[in-house]
Amino acid sequence: MTNSRRNFIKNSALAAAGVMVAPSNIFASEKANNLIGVQLYSVRADMKANPIATLEQLAKIGYKHVEHAFYANRKFYGYSPTEFKKILDGFGLQMPSGHSTLEIKHWDAAKKDFTDEWKYTVEDAATAGMQYVISAWLDDELRVNYEAMRSFADVFNKSGELCNKYGMKFGYHNHNFEFSKNLNGHSVYE
């Protein structure tokens, strides 16, 4: 077989066509960055009994990320944000997110501002090294009143702005009730 321009073009076209129909996994690719963690709510009884021992066991199992499910009185599981971050760091754990419920009581409608309690919640999340503040629940009265829910959606957006000031994002942990049509024929997501 002699090399000719015609053979070169034909073979190049065949090679290009072969690459297009080849399975995508035959080429080397970077390893996927799967950030699998554990929501500490799933081990809440253990965290309540002994948070340090529980975190140590989770780290030994191989978890690298945790999501808190208990924050009260400016503490995560009884520890200040700085103390809790130090504990996590000691076990090689990170806490990119956590559940802290934004409730009606956290918004002062007269002042059009958050209460100090919610401001501290966001500040403490940043101190603990979080990237996301997740509200885990909606007040019952919001789940049955369409106008109240629409109005509170604005508060959610303002919480996003507050979190953004600390380099974080705000989110909501949904459930099945957000898809029901109990808000004057509307769902929460409408």
Residues covered by each model-derived region:
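Active-site acidic/histidine proton-transfer and metal-coordination neighborhood
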Residues: 13-14, 20, 107-190
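Active-site beta-loop-alpha junctions enriched in small/polar residues
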Residues: 41-43, 69-73, 100-103, 138-140, ...
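C-terminal segment of N-terminal export signals and the immediately downstream linker at the start
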Residues: 24-53, 57
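Hydrophobic faces of well-ordered beta-strands that scaffold small-molecule active sites
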Residues: 34-39, 66-68, 95-100, 133-135, ...
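Acidic (Asp/Glu)-rich catalytic clusters
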Residues: 31, 55-60, 77-97, 117-129, ...
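Hydrophobic alpha-helical segments of integral membrane proteins
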Residues: 20-22, 41, 96
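Active-site mouth loops of central-metabolism enzymes
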Residues: 37-49, 101-115, 145
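N-terminal secretory signal peptides and thylakoid transit peptides that target proteins
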Residues: 1-16
